[in-house]
């Protein structure tokens, strides 16, 4: 098919409203859904057909369909080409669903050249697997994407080789979901002399062979979802595998192998009391998490968590633009929404004080310039939260109720 493709990332530039195109496709996450719908409505009013896809339309297809000529539900490797063929033939359907037998083998390499590399910290990203074997109640992955998928290791290696880069980031949600696959992948990566980072679970510390292979393959940093220090909260969210893990041992094992940790924690579980913020920050400082991140529990639509809170009448708003992990969109069980918001902000600021950064990085003994730079970036974020997102909506909600 002879087609000109223009790719626009609204994270770095706004979409020109006078854009001239035969067909427009918009991919939306929940936090960007209102903006996506607004753009779709605008271009449709100009007579340009619009297709909506991505995780949010996959979670709430009927809602998305109100703003589109067609929607793509699920992954689009097979459905998008079929949609384009149908469009050219004048027979585009209203909905395209992911093939349950979708395979990630022999796919074309991503067109990274369509994005302006100067606007990104790195373009060196690759994906080996999709999905996750776990079913955490707050996570959209089981609801949106279904079964886990894998690219053949040979395809992943070929993609990396054609990028001609020595540093890269794996975007996989859980790179070790299939341990045998992960070991095969790490063995091949070791021959490429790379340095890489990625996402996984605390379960990586259960297997010394796997952890050693990751280190030898060039792993220098991993994002781990600790989520909570409370066994009750972990059970509540169906993350019981974390309950079998000694967090102190996880950090020690990774640091011993020169692997830095981006540790992610969530506030707002039903078992969380107002002292959860100080307890979590104390733990982060005690074990020297290299790059901590905090999020507010967010009940994304169509997840088990959303259905529970909806049934209990605890959803505070359906303004999807607030569903970004930094707004309070549900009524917490043991504190007010305002307390949850202010406690999260306090945790960010306390963790990223200069002395806190120095203590964590010096004691972890992983000396990487990128870690220091990332901590300074998060310090800026922590001290300017109100400019990064509209954090006063709970205050306005409180005033409206008065």
Q: PLM ranges: what are they?
A:
Residues 28, 32, 56, 72, ...:
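Structured beta->alpha junctions
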Residues 63-81, 213-223, 279-294:
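Structural recognition of alpha->loop->beta junctions
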Residues 51, 72, 95-96, 197-199, ...:
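Structural detector of well-ordered beta-strand residues that form the stable sheet scaffold
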Residues 2-7, 22, 116-118, 304-306, ...:
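Radical SAM enzyme core and accessory elements
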Residues 63, 179-180, 232-237, 267-275, ...:
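Flexible glycine/acidic-rich beta-alpha junction loops that bind and position SAM and/or redox cofactors
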Residues 109-262, 267-269, 273-274, 278-282:
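Radical SAM [4Fe-4S] cluster-binding motif and immediate context
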């Amino acid at each position: 098919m002879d087609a000109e493709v223009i790719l626009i990332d609204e994270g770095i530039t706004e979409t020109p409203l006078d854009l001239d195109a035969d067909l427009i496709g918009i991919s939306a996450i929940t936090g960007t859904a209102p903006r996506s719908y607004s753009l779709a409505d605008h271009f449709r009013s100009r007579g340009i057909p619009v297709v909506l896809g991505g995780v949010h339309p996959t979670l709430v297809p009927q809602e998305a369909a109100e703003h589109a000529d067609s929607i793509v539900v699920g992954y689009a490797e097979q459905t998008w080409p079929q949609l384009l063929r149908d469009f050219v033939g004048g027979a585009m359907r209203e909905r395209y669903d992911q093939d349950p037998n979708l395979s990630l083998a022999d796919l074309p390499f991503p067109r990274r050249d369509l994005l302006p590399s100067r606007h990104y910290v790195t373009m060196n990203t690759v994906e080996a697997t999709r999905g996750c074997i776990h079913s955490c109640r707050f996570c959209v992955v089981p609801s949106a994407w279904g079964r886990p998928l894998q690219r053949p290791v040979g395809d992943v290696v070929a993609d990396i080789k054609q990028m001609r880069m020595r540093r890269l980031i794996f975007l996989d949600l859980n790179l070790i979901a299939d341990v045998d696959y992960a070991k095969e992948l790490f063995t091949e990566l070791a021959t490429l002399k790379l340095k890489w980072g990625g996402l996984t679970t605390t379960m990586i510390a259960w297997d010394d062979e796997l952890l050693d292979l990751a280190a030898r393959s060039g792993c220098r940093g991993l994002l781990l979802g600790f989520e909570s220090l409370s066994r009750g909260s972990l059970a509540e969210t169906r993350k019981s595998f974390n309950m079998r893990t000694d967090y102190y041992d996880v950090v020690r094992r990774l640091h011993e192998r020169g692997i830095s940790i981006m540790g992610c924690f969530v506030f707002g579980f039903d078992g969380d009391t107002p002292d959860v913020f100080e307890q979590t920050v104390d733990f982060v400082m005690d074990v020297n998490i290299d790059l901590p991140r905090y999020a507010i529990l967010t009940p994304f639509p169509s997840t088990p968590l959303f259905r529970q809170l909806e049934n209990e009448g605890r959803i505070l708003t359906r303004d999807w633009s607030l569903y970004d992990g930094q707004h309070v969109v549900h009524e917490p069980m043991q504190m007010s929404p305002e307390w949850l918001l202010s406690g999260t902000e306090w945790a960010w600021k306390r963790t990223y004080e200069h002395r806190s950064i120095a203590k964590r990085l010096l004691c972890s003994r992983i000396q990487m310039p990128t870690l220091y730079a990332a901590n300074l970036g998060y310090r800026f974020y922590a001290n300017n939260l109100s400019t990064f997102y509209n954090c006063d909506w709970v205050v306005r909600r409180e005033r409206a109720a008065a």
